[in-house]
Amino acid sequence: MNHPTRKLHRLQTWDYSAPGYYFITICTKEKRCVLSSITDGQLRLTQIGAIAEKCWLRMNTVAPHITTDYYCVMPNHIHGIVVIGQHPPEAARSIPDLIHAYKSTVTREVNRLVPPEQRNQLWQSSYYDEIIRTEQMLLETRRYIEDNPRKWAEDDLFIYT
């Protein structure tokens, strides 16, 4: 039986454990607005969104060479910049590994609050990334993340709730 070929989201020639800045977007399953709400440009986290934020910030404790930069927990997605600093080869952690661990941790913590029969898949199966290669691109990405709540109605992922 022939199965459809899945589109590869990662740049095949790039080492995603290499030092650098990575712009990450993680969407909820079916773009459900369960992470936050935005009214008049003001963002309010839900209980699930607060867990997602706490786990995002916890990435700073994974390894000394991994930090988070600007981030925003939107209603149905998270934007954030992950920074991988210089590290010895044996300490390498790749972006796919970090995002997999992040999504698993958030899901596990959320599932502790919900009866088994009410649990749903929280995340879409993949995520989007962009390698930030210049200082200008970093500044533009930070501005985009910072402005995202105010521009929610213009966002490609906007869903009226």
Regions found by a protein language model. Give the residues of each.
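Short catalytic/metal-binding and nucleic-acid-binding patches
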Residues: 1-161
